Design a protein with these regions (language model features):
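HDAC/HDAC-like amidohydrolase catalytic core signature
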Residues: 1-244
C-alpha cells in the first residue's frame, strides 16, 4: 500500500513533496538521481512497504532506496527516506524506542540527518570509509548516533568483529522495541560500485545478529547494484533473520 503524504511529511518538507509530485518529464534531480512522472508513485509505494515491514516484521524489497534522501531534496538515487519515515511511523504508533542498523556500504547520511538528536531513535551505520557521501567518518559518533567506518577491502570477519564490538553493545544499551535494518548489499565482494568483500554468508550473519537485538526486527532494501547476485544475497539475509 502506498504511503500518504502525511506519513512522508513526518520527515520531508511539504515543498519538497510538491516538487516530486509535480515532475512531468524525466530529468536529473541531482547529479546522481533521476526523477520523472512516475517517481512519486514509486516512492510512495516504497515508503508504504517500509511502513508495512515495520508493522509486521517483514523485509521490504523496494526501489527507490532511501537512506541518502534529505528532508528537502533527493540524493544518491534516493527520493524519500523510507527507513526514517518507517521509524517515525513506529514511534507515532506507540513504540517507544526504535534502533536503525544500516549496513549499506555507504553511510546513511540522510537517515542520520533526520534522526540525530531524536531520543526515541538510535542510528548505527557500518560503511566503507573514505567513500561517498564522505560523511560518517571517524569522530562523528555521539548521542543517539554510532558511525563505524571500515576500510576498503573489509569482509565478513571485519564486519562481524565491528558488529560485535561496537554495534551490538550500543544497540542493546538503547533497549529498542524494534530494530529496523537498512539492508544494503553493495558491500558484497562482486558489487561494481564499492570495494568491500562481504559474502552471502556474511550478510546472513549480519541479519542474524541484527535479529537478536530487539523483540521485533524489520528490514528495507537499500543499495545493491549487481543484479545477478542481489536476489541470492537477499535470500541469505532472510535466512539470517529467520534463524533467530
Amino acid at each position: 500500500m502506498a504511503a500518504s503524504r502525511a506519513q512522508v511529511e513526518r520527515v520531508h518538507t511539504a515543498a519538497y513533496v510538491d516538487v516530486i509530485a509535480g515532475l512531468e518529464v524525466e530529468c536529473m534531480l541531482t547529479i546522481d538521481t533521476v526523477g520523472g512522472p512516475t517517481t512519486l508513485e514509486a516512492s510512495l509505494l516504497a515508503v508504504g512497504c517500509a511502513i508495512e515491514a515495520v508493522e509486521t516484521g517483514g523485509f521490504a524489497v523496494v526501489r527507490p532506496p532511501g537512506h541518502h534522501a534529505l528532508v528537502d531534496r533527493p540524493m544518491g538515487f534516493c527520493i524519500f527516506g523510507n527507513v526514517a519515515i518507517a521509524a517515525r511511523h513506529a514511534i507515532g504508533s506507540g513504540v517507544e524506542r526504535v534502533a536503525i542498523v544500516d549496513w549499506d556500504v555507504h553511510h546513511g547520511n540522510g537517515t542520520e540527518a533526520v534522526v540525530r538528536d531524536d531520543p526515541a531513535i538510535f542510528f548505527a551505520s557500518m560503511h566503507q570509509w573514505p567513500f561517498y557521501p564522505f560523511t560518517g567518518g571517524p569522530g562523528t559518533s555521539g548521542g543517539n548516533v554510532l558511525n563505524v567506518p571500515l576500510p576498503e577491502g573489509s569482509g565478513d570477519d571485519e564486519y562481524a568483529r565491528a558488529f560485535e564490538a561496537e554495534v551490538e553493545p550500543a544497540v542493546r544499551a538503547f533497549e529498542p522495541e524494534v530494530v529496523l535494518v537498512s539492508a544494503g548489499f553493495d558491500a558484497h565482494e562482486a558489487d561494481p560500485l564499492a570495494g568491500m568483500r562481504v559474502t552471502a554468508a556474511g550478510f546472513r550473519d549480519l541479519a542474524a545478529r541484527s535479529a537478536q537485538l530487539a523483540p521485533r526486527v524489520a528490514a528495507v532494501l537499500e543499495g545493491g547494484y549487481n543484479v545477478a547476485t542481489l536476489p541470492a544475497l537477499v535470500r541469505s539475509a532472510l535466512q539470517g533473520f529467520e534463524s533467530v
